[in-house]
Amino acid sequence: MSGNTLGTLFTVTTFGESHGPAIGCVIDGCPPGLALNEADIQLELDRRKPGTSRHVTQRQEEDKVEILSGVFEGQTTGAPIALLIRNTDQRSKDYGNIADTFRPGHADYTYWQKYGIRDYRGGGRSSARLTAPTVAAGAVAKKWLREKFGTEIRGYMAALGEIDVPFVDWAHVRENPFFVPNQQIVPQLEAYMDALRKEGDSIGARINVVASGVPVGLGEPLFDRLDADIAHAMMGINAVKGVEIGAGFASVAQRGSVHGDELTPEGFVGNHAGGVLGGISTGQDITVSIAIKPTSSIRTPRRSIDKAGQPAVVETFGRHDPCVGIRATPIAESMLALVLIDHALRHRAQCGDVSVSTPKIAASAP
């Protein structure tokens, strides 16, 4: 299994399985001198950890991070940063009934066909449990970007199943377990999830992420375009089936006179491009939307096959998120942060001394 590393200069390699003794990551390429401690990382992990409400998996993991290397006297040294998170609440017996069968919609079948061996306990390496190290690494990236450029990366749930969530205020996002920017809709979402759980089914979600204060010039055309790497990273999140940058698929119905964001001396007029033109950041907000499929581990009986290719009926009885999208907001934020820090370092390496006479215009015209 060779696809475990993200990035070019700022790289993150994750390791571990859902029911193994621990999970974690190694960050290489982090600039030295960044003030960093475990509390900085724990703040982000606590936003993602399981068992925080009745609407997510009831697996009780504290997700306490340990910094094993790369930090001395409270500062990064430039050496690899190893982060460890111990698993403490595995319940592998719940998965005995799927040891020889494949859950519809899950990676069980493809992992078995590719590797000829499969850790069926909690999904093994394919589990969303492995997003915790990504969030830990993202916390480091967020801190560096904030201190270097003033970049802020924020996300929210924009839709739960067929329920669209009107945006009201960023302040609401941290006040509810759904990460929605609209407190008034929370009771409706809770009732929806309660009914879904009783039915033994699951549902998908849409998450929006916005990065503000991103400097102009990040991105490496042609094949390492900023938006291409963002899409690549977002598709690396478990259960993500679609990514939009800016207007995304709505661009199909827009005319060029509408979609093209006009430039004035006072700033850009509109941001249909989502902060990226020609694969390079414009200095505007980078806007990303991801679609997350319904969780495949459900109590509803489903048709499948066993390892011998014989018909089987699969029911899953473990502790699972009925909507993995509920905890996906900090994960998507972290992925965006990891791409941005990597491209910031790449830009500095090649184009740090480039200057032009044209002034940088504002992200939006007044």
Curated annotation (Swiss-Prot):
PROSITE patterns: CHORISMATE_SYNTHASE_1, CHORISMATE_SYNTHASE_2, CHORISMATE_SYNTHASE_3. SUPFAM superfamilies: Chorismate synthase, AroC. Pathway: Metabolic intermediate biosynthesis; chorismate biosynthesis; chorismate from D-erythrose 4-phosphate and phosphoenolpyruvate: step 7/7. GO terms for cellular component: cytosol. NADP(+) binds at residues 48, 54. Reduced FMN (FMNH(2)). It catalyses: 5-O-(1-carboxyvinyl)-3-phosphoshikimate = chorismate + phosphate. GO terms for biological process: amino acid biosynthetic process; aromatic amino acid family biosynthetic process; chorismate biosynthetic process. CDD domains: Chorismate_synthase. One of its GO terms (molecular function) is FMN binding. FMN binds at residues 125-127, 238-239, 278, 293-297, 319. Its EC number is 4.2.3.5. Keywords: Amino-acid biosynthesis, Aromatic amino acid biosynthesis, FAD, Flavoprotein, FMN, Lyase, NADP. Pfam families: Chorismate_synt. Its cofactor is FMNH2. Homotetramer. HAMAP family: Chorismate_synth. This reaction introduces a second double bond into the aromatic ring system. Belongs to the chorismate synthase family. This is Chorismate synthase. It comes from Paraburkholderia xenovorans (strain LB400). The gene is aroC.
